[in-house]
């Protein structure tokens, strides 16, 4: 029997043109849809496929560790976000 574990991630969603873009942090996987719900659903599928592929290739542990996850008590624990902020910088064009 294959052991399964939950791998949590934070989702950011923003509008880009007529699409909504969903980004899974810290895995750095993205997807899009015509609504926030479609983008979220597409992202969940993309993350699932990304993680299954990594597991099949034997690189899941390396990918999760590079993304800041830690393996504790049989589970992968993602980073604890201290802040997610929007900043700007002035640039002369």
Question: Which residues fall in each region the model found?
Answer:
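Short, charged, surface-exposed hinge/linker loops at domain edges
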Residues: 1-8, 37, 41-93
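A short, exposed loop/beta-hairpin motif centered on an aromatic-Gly-Thr core
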Residues: 27-38
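Generic alpha-helical hydrophobic packing signal
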Residues: 21-23, 30, 50
């Amino acid at each position: 029997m294959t052991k399964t574990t939950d791998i949590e991630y934070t989702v950011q969603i923003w509008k880009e043109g007529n699409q909504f873009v969903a980004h899974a942090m810290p895995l750095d996987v993205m997807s899009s849809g015509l609504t926030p719900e479609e983008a979220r659903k597409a992202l969940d599928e993309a993350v699932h496929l990304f993680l299954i592929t990594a597991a099949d290739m034997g690189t899941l542990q390396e990918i999760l560790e590079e993304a800041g996850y830690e393996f504790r008590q049989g589970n992968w624990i993602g980073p604890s976000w201290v802040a997610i902020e929007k900043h700007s910088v002035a640039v002369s064009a």
